[in-house]
Amino acid sequence: MQRLAQDWLVLQLTGSPAAVGLAVALQFLPMLVVGPISGVLVDLFPKRRILMACQSVAALLAAGLAVWNAMGGTDVWVVYGSCIALGITSSIDGPARQVFVNEVVGDAGLPAAIGLNSAIGQLGAMLGPALAGVVIAQAGPAAAFATNAGIGVAVLVMIAIIRPSELHHAHDPDGPPRDKRGQILAGFNYVSARPQLLLIMLLAGLLGAFGMNGPVVLAAFADRVWHSGPAGFGLFNMVSALGALVGALLAARIKHLGRKGIVGSAALFGLTQLLAALMPTQELFVAMLVVVGFMTLMFLTSAATSVQLEAGASVRGRVLALYFPLLLGGHALGGLLAGWLTEDFGVRTALVVTGALGMASALVIGFLLWLLGRKRSLDRAR
């Protein structure tokens, strides 16, 4: 809800999809800088307290934008500043939230829990844009920010009532070194020694760059192609989240697709995005967005499960702190790319190009994973 309201406000203030792309980038680029440090924080401090702190900051940012916009603020750089602050907060919140899921259910229930957690997140992503679209259309962005601040307080209360004594605290006897530099490098060293894990994380980054550009292209489709305004923008986000909800629930039921399934879902994600760009009517476009959302969460849930299951307990936060910057940092760069393509060549062309690049990335990573598997088989045969 917060990000949709921010993106729509930037489009209102500037009239530029490229400016929306910059807003998206500013939300996610801080993760490239803060990510490795946030992983150390997540591994060393109680996740519940970290989540409460992050949620408090996010609620304050929403409340601040609500007051500023209600008072008639028009300086887009204030929104950009909020995007940066939210990006820093999210770079800590993301790894902490994922590891906290592990603490709630333990390793045995992790695959299903990741899928269910993604499903619940997508339910929020489905209701949030729909609610934001209605609120913005009826009362403006300030009301949407204020509503989100209130929801943030409710989430903070929910986290606070979780009992720490009931959590599963994993311990790894081969944990990372205790010196600060070693703690930061532990995640890098762990991932670099596991090329298949590295390739899955790289694929997430490439799909983030080429596929997860919804805030830019969906705003442009609503504004320039279908002329449906904020209500249409909210609808497009809602149906994408509906498909994502189904994808997350199915991924939770399957539990683990395996590397072939991860690569296949990534390739289909790019293909469905490309096809959505070619739809001649808004009704068909909306229908394709459901499929795009479905493939998005099939890939993301399966990739996140694979990364967490392969990471040792003592470095899980640090590994996720590398995974999220790759995924969301790619998202930031992809927002700039999609904004530039939309500005200069049109939003349909932008979606075709990024969809094709996402599909090509999946095929290349799939080939590299096949080569690694073949090499291992030959080594064992010797």
What do these predicted ranges mean?
Residues M1-R382:
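Alpha-helical transmembrane-bundle signature of multi-pass membrane transport and export proteins
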